[in-house]
């Protein structure tokens, strides 16, 4: 089993790139990502393949998880981990939240089926639009437990086997049957694991007040129709072992979380045989927190530079290195020039608001920094002038000494 994964420091670096390109939006389109992707100097056909692999949900854009996948693929290609773009995503690189989509797409037979349409029109008042096919790690783990507790010897689920679950939900029977028909286009007596997870996800959202969707993604529908995937735990392959963290907030403030009471009666609540093998982005720091971290880090770096410059200036006042017991004026002059150049650059960045100086620092602090650096620059110039005079005097003394001999 591969031990490779995307490290947290990589996620942080990718987030800085993603947030700078997305302008606060949750997705990147091709035009927004083009510059950073082409900086890799990979061929255009390779970048197209990387994009297709990373765009797991097939919406033509990259969310943050998919962007991380694309960047890691590119870095591995550049560093020689792959001779060419792989034909499919490695299991360890698949985001856990989208593992069901990847597995469903692997069931495609080459044709692109149309979306399934539900004939019933849902006119129930008070329901919300915006059904999302995304399964959080906690929800997916719960669906896995319900499936494992009710599957038959072929790894399939019948409609009636979940009757106790239906009884625990605030979902009308007509909506439950509509959801079943949506994931069971062949009208068979049983459904596969993929279809079961989708069915439970629809019921969960309906339980939370969302309308039953009218269509399903094409890749999911293909897996429902094939109904040939072996999901029995004894025969499970590494590529199928996707799971999720079982830690989930169970409070809604108005009713029990989907399936909690049912799983509690079954005695399997909180336990799952699944363990994650892909990359879990569920604990990724949110936008506001990332912005705070970035600004604090930049402020600390700026203060550290100023402190280092102040310390260097103080050490110069105490005298530089020595040659034969005397001051090394050449070294002092060189270091003073370097420090002067550094301070002038810092002063320019502070005045222009460039470099490490960002909008997160207060105007009053910037003014104080500008004044402090300006005073230090003037002091260094005066100090350098005095040292040059001293150096000239020493050279004159050396010449006089040589002539006297």
Curated annotation (Swiss-Prot):
Gene Ontology annotations for the cellular component aspect, listed alphabetically: actin cortical patch; endosome membrane; plasma membrane
**Purpose:** Component of the PAN1 actin cytoskeleton-regulatory complex required for the internalization of endosomes during actin-coupled endocytosis. The complex links the site of endocytosis to the cell membrane-associated actin cytoskeleton. Mediates uptake of external molecules and vacuolar degradation of plasma membrane proteins. Plays a role in the proper organization of the cell membrane-associated actin cytoskeleton and promotes its destabilization.
* Residues the record lists as binding Ca(2+): 55, 57, 59, 61, 66
What is the protein named? Actin cytoskeleton-regulatory complex protein END3
Q: According to its UniProt record, which protein family does this protein belong to?
A: Belongs to the END3 family.
The UniProt GO MF terms for this protein read: actin binding; calcium ion binding
Compartments where found: Cell membrane; Endosome membrane; Cytoplasm, Cytoskeleton, Actin patch
Q: Which residues form a coiled coil?
A: 280-405
The source's superkingdom equals Eukaryota
Gene Ontology biological process:
actin filament organization; endocytosis; endosomal transport
């Amino acid at each position: 089993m591969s031990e490779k994964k995307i490290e947290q420091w990589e996620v942080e670096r990718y987030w800085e790139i993603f947030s700078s390109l997305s302008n606060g939006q949750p997705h990147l389109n091709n035009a927004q990502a083009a510059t950073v992707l082409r900086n890799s100097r990979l061929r255009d056909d390779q970048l197209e393949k990387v994009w297709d692999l990373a765009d797991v949900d097939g919406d033509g854009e990259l969310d943050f998880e998919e962007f991380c996948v694309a960047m890691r693929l590119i870095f591995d290609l550049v560093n020689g981990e792959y001779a060419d773009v792989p034909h499919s995503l490695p299991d360890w690189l698949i985001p856990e939240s989208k593992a069901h989509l990847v597995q469903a797409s692997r069931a495609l037979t080459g044709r692109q089926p149309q979306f399934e349409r539900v004939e019933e029109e849902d006119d129930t008042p008070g329901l919300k639009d915006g059904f999302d096919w995304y399964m959080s790690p906690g929800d997916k783990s719960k669906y896995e437990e319900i499936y494992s507790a009710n599957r038959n010897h072929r790894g399939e689920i019948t409609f009636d086997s979940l009757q106790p679950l239906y009884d625990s939900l605030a979902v009308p029977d007509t909506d439950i049957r509509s959801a079943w028909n949506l994931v069971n286009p062949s009208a068979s007596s049983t459904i596969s694991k993929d279809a079961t997870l989708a069915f439970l996800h629809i019921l969960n959202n309906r339980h939370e007040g969302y309308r039953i969707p009218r269509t399903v993604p094409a890749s999911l529908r293909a897996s429902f129709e094939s109904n040939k995937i072996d999901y029995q735990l004894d025969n499970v392959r590494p590529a199928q072992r996707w799971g999720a963290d079982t830690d989930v907030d169970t409070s809604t403030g108005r009713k029990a979380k989907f399936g909690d009471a049912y799983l509690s009666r079954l005695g399997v609540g909180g336990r799952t045989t699944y363990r994650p093998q892909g990359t879990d982005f569920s604990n990724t720091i949110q936008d506001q927190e990332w912005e705070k971290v970035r600004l604090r880090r930049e402020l600390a770096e700026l203060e550290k530079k100023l402190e280092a410059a102040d310390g260097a200036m103080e050490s110069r006042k105490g005298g530089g290195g020595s040659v034969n017991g005397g001051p090394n004026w050449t070294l002092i002059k060189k270091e003073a020039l370097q420090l002067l150049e550094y301070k002038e650059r810092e002063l320019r960045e502070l005045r222009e608001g460039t470099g490490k100086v960002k909008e997160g620092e207060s105007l009053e602090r910037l003014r104080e920094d500008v004044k402090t650096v300006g005073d230090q620059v003037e002091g260094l110039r005066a100090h350098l002038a005095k040292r040059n005079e001293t150096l000239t005097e020493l050279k004159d003394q050396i010449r006089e000494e040589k002539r006297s001999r």
